[in-house]
Each structure stands twice: as C-alpha cells, then as structure tokens.
Amino acid sequence: MPEVPADNPTTTFATIELKESAPLQAAFHQTTESENVLSMEDLGVDFGYIHYQTTINKAGKQKLIIQDLRDYAVILVDGKQVASLDRRYNQNSTTLDIHKVPATLEILVENTGRVNYGPDILFNRKGITSQVLWGNEKLTGWSITPLPLYKEEVSSLSFGQEIKGVPAFHRGTFIIEQQGDCFVDMSQWGKGAVWVNGKSLGRFWNCLLYTSPSPRDSTS
C-alpha cells in the first residue's frame, strides 16, 4: 500500500470586514402570486430558500401558526425581524403583537436538507406545506419567491450600504498570501451561507466552521 499522504499545508488570513450589503430582494427573480401558500416543489425548486409575503389586516396579540413548516423560518413584520421557528424542535408558532394594520408579513424559509430513507421520505416537501394562521384566521393572498441562489444569481448582486438586523447578503474582500487550507470562522454569526469568489462554500450555524479549499489571491 502507498504511504499515507502528507497533510495539506495550511494558511490563514486576517479578520474580514463585511461593510457592503445587498437586500434579500435583490435576489428576487420570479415571484408567484397565489391565494394559498405553495411549497418549493410546487414552484419547481429543489433546494435553497423560499420567501413568502402577505398582509395581516387584523390588529392584536395572538399566535401566528405555520402548519407543516419545513424546515427553518425567519419571520419579519413590516421589515423587522421578530421571530424564528425551527422544525427540529417542533416549533410551528410564535406570538406576535400587531398594533398597526395593514402589516406586511414576511416568512423566509430555509430547506435544510432531505432524508433518503424511512417513512418520512414520502412526506418531505419543503417550504410551508400546509397553511398559515393568524389566530384562527387563515392568511391568504401570498407573493411567493423561490431563492435557489445559483452561482450566477449571487455573483450578479449589486452591493451597497451595510444592512443590519434582517436577512441580507454581505460582502468583504480578503487576500491570501500563501496557498493552503484554511477555515472561515462564523461563530459570531447566526445562520446563513458562505460563497467565496462566487462558489458556494456551504451553510453555517453559529457553532460551525467551514473549510475553505485553498483560495488564492484576492477573494470576496
């Protein structure tokens, strides 16, 4: 048998400042209007994210219920992030206090992956696969936008002033002086995805590190 190969050389880079941002809506390309919510599969999308938007016309403090959420949702009201829900913990509702109507409700849902075995393989559509309730009232009149975030879509984004507090795209530039394997430390972030020079590096949560495969020169 051949000898075990030597470890790849490693390198490092300085802290990257992400001072440029693009709004989530910059990646919107094909929005579908529907009376009821639609799943990713209904729109011919297999992976990524899907954005739902509708209007709440009844003020008050009550539960927003997302039936059959798959898999992770960020909820915004009038452009402000107010809650998140995670299917892994059987979370499907949150209490909101709506003072002013009409209020714009946005739900950004992430497809976190699929199973390929067991009985759940038959019930594995992604997005919101049933309905959304505001109290006992079914919400209708949805604008639905799939966000598969293909390479060309991400690479063509126009960046500007920094955006904080809501889902968005952020960009920074760094230089690798010496080729080698390295890590992108996202421990101070929440949840999202990383691209290097337009190539998808992977998704992250705040407890994970992602390996960057020997980037060279100036990257963003």
Task: Place the predicted regions along the sequence by residue.
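Carbohydrate-binding surfaces of carbohydrate-active enzymes
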Residues: 1-125, 130-133, 138-141, 152-157
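Short beta-strands within extracellular/lumenal beta-sheet-rich domains
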Residues: 47-55, 165-174
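Generic structural detector for well-ordered beta-strands
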Residues: 55-57, 95-97, 173-175, 185, ...
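Aromatic-lined ligand-binding clefts that engage carbohydrates, nucleic acids, or primary amines
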Residues: 62-76, 105, 174-197, 204, ...
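Surface-exposed loop/edge segments in extracytoplasmic proteins
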Residues: 80-84, 199-204
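C-terminal beta-rich recognition modules with glycine/proline-rich loops and embedded aromatic residues
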Residues: 134-136, 140-172, 180-185, 190
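Single conserved hydrophobic/aromatic residue that forms the stacking wall/gate
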Residues: 210-219
